[in-house]
A protein has these predicted regions:
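ABC family nucleotide-binding domain
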Residues: 2-4, 9-213, 217
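Conserved beta-strand-loop-alpha-helix hinge in the C-terminal portion
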Residues: 221-245
Length: 254
């Protein structure tokens, strides 16, 4: 079942200086199936960040539409957007975005607190999740007391605590060392196998090689895509590297 549909998305900005029109997206179209793990790649300025902001209901396209389970994001009333994001989307950021004055436990539970859930409901949702992610032993610590990898695991737990329809990850390995990055990517594979739909924007070939499909954006359009098929991570890594070389040299992918 298609959980996300992106149809002919366009986005035009007015430049801050000079007033020129800048077209960041020029007609992006793709869909994501429930349970898929999709990575989006592209050079700086290709439109990845603009697209992610639209998918996160943080911005609206100037043309086209985005539908999550058949619901148009641009049709949601402004007053309802925060609740929609909280109930349907999970977010994992490069810089973790944990609150230093909150314990790890309180950071994870924050979306449920904002949703008005009972203490019993919150504990029931959190306990199996933190055990699965291997952070049940750091819940009473504060973010500044744990490692970068543990912070990112806590951020993933916070993103998944509401059982989101779609998990959006923005450069999730960008602030991690190689060991913590590998750990996080294995964790993403695990939660994806359990049925979580993931859409990840990344510059990292290694991170993208863990996905089931990779979309490449160039000059505001989807330029090419690769399906994993039966490829290993190493084989997919090479395919991605070859495609990025084509992007940089301006040649078309075969």
């Amino acid at each position: 079942m298609e959980i996300l549909q992106v149809k002919e998305n366009k986005k035009t900005y007015t430049a801050r200086f000079g007033g020129n029109q800048v077209q960041a997206l020029k007609g992006v179209s793709f869909s994501v199936q429930e349970g898929e793990y999709v990575a989006i790649m592209g050079e700086s300025g290709s439109g990845k960040t603009t697209l992610l902001n639209i998918l996160a209901a943080l911005d609206k396209p100037t043309g086209g539409q985005v539908m999550l389970e058949g619901k148009r994001l641009d049709a949601i009333e402004e007053r309802d957007l925060a609740a929609f994001r909280r109930d349907n989307l999970g977010f994992v950021f490069q810089e973790f975005n944990l609150l230093d004055t909150f314990s790890i436990e309180d950071n994870i539970l924050l979306p449920l607190v904002l949703a008005g859930r009972s203490v019993a409901e919150m504990k029931s949702a959190m306990e199996p999740l933190v055990r699965s992610l291997g952070i049940d032993n750091i819940l009473k610590k504060f973010p500044y007391e744990v490692s970068g990898g543990q912070k990112q695991r806590a951020a993933v737990a916070r993103a998944m605590i509401t059982n989101p329809k779609l998990l959006l990850a923005d450069e999730p390995t960008g602030a991690l060392d190689s060991a913590s990055s590998a750990d996080l990517l294995q964790m993403f594979e695990k939660v994806n196998r359990q049925g979580q739909t993931i859409l990840m924007v990344t510059h990292s070939v290694d991170a993208a090689s863990h996905a089931g499909r990779v979309l490449f954006i160039r000059d505001g359009v989807v330029f090419h895509q690769i399906y994993r098929g039966e490829s290993t991570n190493q084989q997919l890594y090479k395919k991605i590297s070859d495609t990025l070389t084509m992007l940089r040299t301006g040649r078309d992918a075969e």
